[in-house]
Every structure is written in structure tokens, then in C-alpha cells.
Amino acid sequence: MHTHTSHGIESDAMLRFHKSPVSALEPFYLPSPFVVNGEPLLLASLVSADENGWVVWWDLGTKRPLGTWRAHESTIVTVQQMGIHWDADVPQLHRNTFGKLLTHGRDNCVRIWDLFRVSSFSSMDWNLCKVLHKTRDTARNPDVYEIPVNALNFCNVATRAEMIATPASLSSESFDIYVVSNHRLERLHSNVDICQILQQNQRSNETDENRKFGAIMQITWTGDFQLAVGYESGIVACIQLQERHTQVVWIDSSHLTHPILGIVSNLDRVFTCSASDRIVVNSLQTGKTVAISKIKHKGISSLDVTINNSICLVSVTTWDGFSRIYRYDEDSSAAVDEALKGVFIPWTKLRRIPPKVIPNFKSSSNHQTIDLPDLKGRVIKLSKTQNGCNNALVERSDGQSKMILRSSEKRALTRYAFVGYQDGRVATYILCDS
């Protein structure tokens, strides 16, 4: 375990299981025995996935797996907890799907797994659905049902409440919407084509060819019936789903010609990244661009956003294998453009500490750098915690309700940064209060 601290972040641990490059990470929130002002708090665990289809569910307290299983026959593109979404630091739970995990692989399948069930939402009592064996040879899958999807491109799958958005079964330029209802999957919208919708609604002389956006690369929910979709062409579109038709709310072309590689919605803002070196921030309501930052590292392959003590942190992993965290501020005097009020301020650069004994490494001529391809970061994720979970108001709900948290319990409820690496390891960091 490392103890190095840098600018509000502390190295925590290195998790080892995967034999293939890590391809996806997801903080997975569990009920906890803690409350603040009578409200139950959630405890973060972690789900990691790799290019060989394996999933590991990690206990962040013990740094050991709660379960391991092979979920897909090839690379896992998406892992996402169902039944929860966050409004800043306030979690919204959905009873029908809380406790389920969605995985999406390049084997053309989306699978939904039952990991735990809440027996009482008033007391947040819960139990594991099935004991998951911890070794590869005896790994046994949790309960599951699945959806066949198009995996011709690397588009993710996104879920909110009981809704699931997937690439369309027949076209890479369209998407489908499913709902989980009574342990069944129903398709609500089929083959939604944004270019076709714009063509039907256009009042200009634009041709069909000018309306082609290319394959869908990224999709995320921005509201209960609203999505942001990123395309191969660099276009980002915000879509409002309605019962009889779909409305295009706004379109942004700040990334034009660079495929969209990441979309995150937070605090009435939509953050996007692409194969360029740009991070763009748009107003969720109007689509107005409020920030464009060139971070000078092309190919932003992973993007996430969290709020840490009222500070907006934006994390990225780039094609050079490094992970970086920026502080995003719309009230900064550093803004140089009145129209673009948001600025990105470098916060920290995450460096994985290599082992002391490194076989077959190559050093540069000046002996200042080490060429270690397996140390390249692939994906970064930031966890969330509820407002007030790191102060003395946090109590236990098991009869010792006035007991102030011990330091170890506070640590278990803190915010994390996770980085998945090319060699299959996952580094965990703690986002400090200061």
C-alpha cells in the first residue's frame, strides 16, 4: 500500500486479479450501517472488468474480491450499476433495479446481474443474492438476463432507473431504448435515428448528406427521459424522449471531425471529450458552450466528473497512458473569454509507482524515464459520497447511533479515484478533504 500524498490525493492500494488489460470500471454502491441526519449513507465498492470478459467485484475495505466471474466471451465495454443516479452529491435510488449490475461486451450481449437485494428500504437491510466464488476455476455467475446488441463499434450502453439505452440492433448510427419491467425487458423505442429526425423537422435546404453524423460512439442519460449522444463525426446531440416522437434539444459541433470518446453529465453541465485534446462543457438546458479546454494531450479515452467538497473535479486518461485530474471552475478570474466562463485548472497527475524489481525493462539514454508499456492507464473513474458523510454528524444505525466514526470508518466512506491499467491492475486513490 502506498502513502504518497499529492495535492489533495493519497495513493491507497493496488488491486490485482485481472490477467488482461482493464477495460471498464464502475463504483458500485451498497447500503451501509451509517446515517447522517437520519438519512442512510451508501458505501462504495468497485467493479472492474477486462478484455477477456472477466468481472471482479471489490471490497474497498479489505481490498479483496466479493466475487469474480466471466461475464462475456470478449472485451467488456461497459459496467454500470443500475437503480441509482446522482444529482450532485445526492443519490436517487430506484427500488426495482437497485442492486443490479449491467455489463456490455463485444460479444454482442448486454447482461444484467443480480448482486444484492434490499429487503427493507426503510432500514436498508440487504443481502447478497448468491455467494460468488473467488477463484477462476470455480467462478459461478449470479442470476442474469440479457439483450442482444450491435457491437460493431465501441459505443457504450447506458442505464438510468429502469431504462437502458443501447446501440441499435440494425444500425450503428441509431439507438434503442429498453425498460426493465417485472423481470422482463421491453423495447420502448427502436432504431432512433437523430439525422432522420432532423431531416423530418428541417426548414432549410440542407441535404441528407450534410445530416450524416456517423456511428454513435458514446451515449449517456442526462435526465429521466433525456440523453446526450456523441458521434464519430464529433457531433454531440441532446435528445428528449417522448411517447410518440423524439425531440432534438440541441446539437454541438465543438469536436467536429474528432470521434467522441466520453460524455458525462453533472451539475446541469454536459462534459465531452474526443480523439482531440479538447474537453468541452455545454449547458444541459440550452446547449450553449461554456468552456473549451485544450489539455495538450491528444486522445482523451476516459472521462469522469465528481464533486469533492464543493469542488468540481474532472478526470481524464489519455492515449499516452497518463491519468490527470483537473479542477473545473466557472467563477475563476482566469477565464480569458467572456463567452467561455469555465476554466480547467490542473489538480494532479496520477503516476503509478512501478515495482522495485522490473524484468526486461528499457531505460532511455538519459536514464530519466523507464519504458513500461504495461504501466499505461486505460480508464479512470471517480466515486461519489453524500454530503456530510465526512463529519461528526455521521452516526451508526445499529444501536450505537451516537458514536462518532472511527478514522477507518471515515476512510471507508470517502471519495476514491480508480485507474485501470494495461497490465490488469487497478490503482485506488483517496481524494482528500484538503
Curated annotation (Swiss-Prot):
Domain of life: Eukaryota
Gene3D superfamilies in alphabetical order: YVTN repeat-like/Quinoprotein amine dehydrogenase
Record's subcellular location: Nucleus
GO biological process: chromatin organization
Keywords: Chromatin regulator, Nucleus, Repeat, WD repeat
Cellular-component GO terms for this entry: nucleus
Signal sequence bounds: none
WD repeat residue intervals: 17-68, 74-123
Keyword Nucleus assigned: yes
Role according to the record: Component of the ASTRA complex involved in chromatin remodeling.
Summary of subunit composition and partner proteins: Component of the ASTRA chromatin remodeling machinery complex.
Assigned protein family: Belongs to the WD repeat ASA1 family.
Protein name: ASTRA-associated protein 1
Species annotation: Komagataella phaffii (strain GS115 / ATCC 20864) (Yeast)
Upper lineage: Eukaryota, Fungi, Dikarya, Ascomycota, Saccharomycotina
Annotated gene: ASA1
